[in-house]
């Protein structure tokens, strides 16, 4: 069985975690890594079996033509990373939340991915926490009856924590369509 080839861009803590996890799965092989910090890139390469490496994500992607393009970068780099992935022919693009910084950017990302026939996966790792899985199990068992109202709150950077709240609220309820929603924000604009 041939393995899916993976390029991971951004070798900080999260990128290193993704690369290590891909390599631990027998279906994947990290064939390239990318970071603009040369020392961090060298350290990551040594830990990952010395895959090809570089500081130019688009150039490395074009050279490697990975099946999977995974990036763990700042949110303002979403569109250039997705373009690089698609131009290299990647069929799966994996990245961290938030999906985008504006609703217009969501569509600017979504449309070229769809047109290329690729798939995108946004990491919501809270689903793998035992306490979140237990809540999902309890709700699915019917022990609480029909869920008809969900309340939630988040603090801190809205695109960081609120996206988790929205994700697992939808997940807990099998993506039942929302009927009504209300949101409020306070503080500096």
Task: Go through each PLM region and give its residues.
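N-terminal Rossmann-like dinucleotide-binding module
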Residues: 1-48
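Short histidine/acidic/glycine/proline-rich micro-motifs that form metal-
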Residues: 99-100, 126, 154-159
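Rossmann-fold dehydrogenase core element
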Residues: 108-126, 145-150
């Amino acid at each position: 069985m041939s393995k899916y080839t993976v390029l991971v861009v951004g070798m900080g803590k999260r990128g290193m975690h993704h690369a290590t996890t891909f390599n631990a799965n027998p279906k994947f092989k990290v064939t390239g890594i990318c970071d603009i910090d040369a020392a961090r890139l060298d350290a990551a390469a040594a830990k990952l079996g010395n895959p090809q490496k570089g500081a130019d994500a688009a150039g490395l992607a074009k050279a490697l033509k990975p099946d999977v393009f995974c990036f763990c970068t700042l949110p303002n780099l979403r569109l250039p990373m997705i373009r690089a992935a698609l131009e290299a022919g990647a069929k799966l693009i994996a990245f961290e939340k938030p999906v985008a910084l504006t609703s217009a950017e969501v569509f600017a990302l979504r449309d070229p991915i769809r047109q290329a026939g690729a798939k995108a996966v946004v990491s919501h790792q809270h689903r793998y926490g035992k306490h979140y899985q237990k809540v999902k199990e309890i709700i699915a068992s019917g022990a609480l009856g029909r869920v008809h109202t969900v309340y939630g709150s988040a603090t801190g950077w809205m695109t960081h924590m609120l996206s988790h709240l929205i994700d697992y609220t939808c997940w807990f309820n099998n993506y039942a369509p929302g009927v009504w929603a209300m949101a409020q924000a306070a503080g500096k604009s």
